[in-house]
Amino acid sequence: MTDDRFVVSAPYRPTGDQPRAIAQLSAGALGGVTFQTLLGATGTGKTFTIANVIEKVGKPTLVLAHNKTLAAQLCNELREFFPDNAVEYFVSYYDYYQPEAYIPQTDTYIEKSASINDEIDMLRHSATRSLFERRDVIVVASVSCIYGLGMPEEYLRAAIPLKVGSNIDQRELLRQLVTVQYERNDIDLGRGRFRVRGDVVEIGPAYEDRIIRVEFFGDEVEAVRWLDPVTGEVVRSVNSLNIYPAKHFVTPEEQLEQACIAIEQELEARVAELEGENKLLEAQRIKQRTRYDLEMLREVGYCNGVENYSRHLAARRPGEAPSCLIDYFPQDWLLVVDESHVTIPQIRGMYNGDAQRKKVLIDHGFRLPSAADNRPLKAPEFWDKVRQAIFVSATPGDWEVELSGGGRDPETGRMAGEHVAEQIIRPTGVLDPEVFVRPVAGQVDDLLHEIHDRVARRERVLVTTLTKRMAEDLTEYFQERGVKVRYLHSEIQAIERIEILQALRQGDFDVLIGVNLLREGLDLPEVSLVAILDADKEGFLRAERSLIQTIGRAARHVRGQVIMYADRLTASMDKAISETERRRQIQRAYNAAHGLTPQPIVKRLDANSILDYLAVSRRLNQQELEAAAAAPAEVALADIPELVSQLEIQMRDAAKKLEFEKAAEYRDKIHKLRERLLGK
């Protein structure tokens, strides 16, 4: 491992109450405090604060987000802050996933089907490789990282060490590559494949888009080089390196046979149990399915649904927690939970949904009982693995604050505690938005008047309703009156959601209406007004935390305002308004003391998510493709993911035909397009 230290690179220094929060959280982590909370208002630079804490603490860090999109945004920000350190991205690699299921009511069996995103799979392998080879690692992950991943000990033990001057027979290297699930393909070399050309073996590692070339002289390794995958040019030569397995699930041959014996024993016991209950159909079904899987495992070392045998393959005890990404971290690691009030409930809920589906499959003879141990971690198992954690939220939950040695003031409702760092001051001097309460009667026409005012100033408006029907009706009403408005609903996929938000920022439309999608993680500096309809209807969507989060969507604009339409002041409204006013007073006093004039937040419109080039959102026809390839600088951001995908195909085709100049042109265009997406 390297001894590299984290080094933050930024064109500005911590200001406001960032220095105090950084000092408090760093001292706590270095002093052995297990749980801390960063209670930071929207737009106060929480990510920058956490980056500085990571630099001072110096521990490998897992940053947990509650969805792929937010994880991608965090990954981009942290890569900008840590250009010389390893900032990795680890989320579910499925573009599409239909889990195996059985519906007894209709006797319907649904086979597992999935589409794996090759780019994300590479990033996952890159994350685990970095954790083995260096300490200056930040892994930004979604909650899917608590699913089983394969044992890190076996993964590391299976790695193939190569060193210049070492003696190894070429055929032995090929055998080892096959053992760790690389495929030989002398025609099309790619990730997880290798080819042989005389005394040269070329390998496409699972964790890089470059090629490893191993040159032999007899039985001696003469040279090890990294190659450009398109031109074949040598990027650099190295003295030694490890080739990690092509899959995270690695089972040695002797362990595989032991696993098959254990599966046979469990099958025998399960068949006897089902026959004893006179469930003859289920007994025949499990016997037939499992014997077929065993034959496949012994012949090729793999079968469909092999993950359902993971308990036996990993030699775990019944009920024992599976290995996951956390087990790849060293002992002294740090957990950062972003938007903790949303992410922590996800951790608690992951196990229950999975367990219910598996139980039905097991009861009806589709899977052995041990399949239940192919699962995500239970919440207690997850927290048992955590050494130190920092919870980050504008509205942390009671549980996080209590763990951080604090609680809620019964009179004011304010969160505070010994290990709770509060961050209220924005570096830009922008105050929390003003909050107004107006009657429900005439709310739509009043809102329409406010929208016209904002549109005249080229500002944007967010409107949140209680029901999908009301959002649809309101959208139609505003459209009929000439307002450029869009409706954001729950069926919209992550990539399209990014495009809609980008279009709002660009001014393609002025008003965005939604139900529960206008809260955490929306960074929209152009929004100057947030309207909350039916604010006095108590419930999840109008609870104190939800209201504070929604208010925060207008907290990045100098003229930010929030209008709550309500006929009465609920307890949640009162607490949210009081907390917002408390923050405004602190911010106003700080600005006056430091002569600070609020400045608008400037955020590049082309700064986009890593997900934009990891998922293809639309197809381009051939004419559009040729035009886009000829002038990549003029391509619409929304079209870049597909253009990159198709240019990569043409680049590989050109390379196969040995047309390296043309392939290099494609490579350069792809590089420029990706830089545009990443805002470089």
Swiss-Prot record:
Name of encoding gene: uvrB
InterPro entries, per database record: Helicase/UvrB_N (IPR006935), Helicase_ATP-bd (IPR014001), Helicase_C-like (IPR001650), P-loop_NTPase (IPR027417), UVR_dom (IPR001943), UVR_dom_sf (IPR036876), UvrB (IPR004807), UvrB_inter (IPR041471)
Alphabetical list of Pfam families matching this protein: Helicase_C (PF00271), ResIII (PF04851), UVR (PF02151), UvrB (PF12344), UvrB_inter (PF17757)
Gene Ontology cellular component annotations, sorted alphabetically: cytoplasm; excinuclease repair complex
GO MF: ATP binding; ATP hydrolysis activity; DNA binding; excinuclease ABC activity
Record's protein name: UvrABC system protein B
Localization per record: Cytoplasm
Annotated binding of ATP, by residue: G40, A41, T42, G43, T44, G45, K46, T47
Domain (Helicase ATP-binding) ranges: 27-422
